[in-house]
């Protein structure tokens, strides 16, 4: 079942994984997406629920498909 918590966990984990695979620091990604490092850290640690606009920007910067963020 796809409840809010489950979706947020998937998105958070996949953003962190994609960022690490691209060898980009939180500081650099946050700067490129125009959000604070603290906010990106909160997203990656499942403590913030990012808007779709932020998620799309992150995907563009990391050069990944939006659908990759929702996948298992």
Descriptions of predicted regions:
Residues 1-10:
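A detector for short, charged/polar N-terminal pre-domain segments
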Residues 9, 20-21, 49:
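Short amphipathic helical patch at the helix-1/turn junction of helix-turn-helix
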Residues 13-28, 32, 57:
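Short basic helix-loop element that most often maps to the first helix and adjoining turn
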Residues 15, 29-30, 40-43, 69:
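Conserved hydrophobic/aromatic packing and binding residues within compact polymer-binding modules
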Residues 34-49:
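Recognition helix of helix-turn-helix/homeodomain-like DNA-binding domains
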Residues 45, 64, 71:
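Short, conserved catalytic or interaction motifs in soluble domains
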Residues 51-68:
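DNA major-groove recognition helix of helix-turn-helix/homeodomain DNA-binding modules
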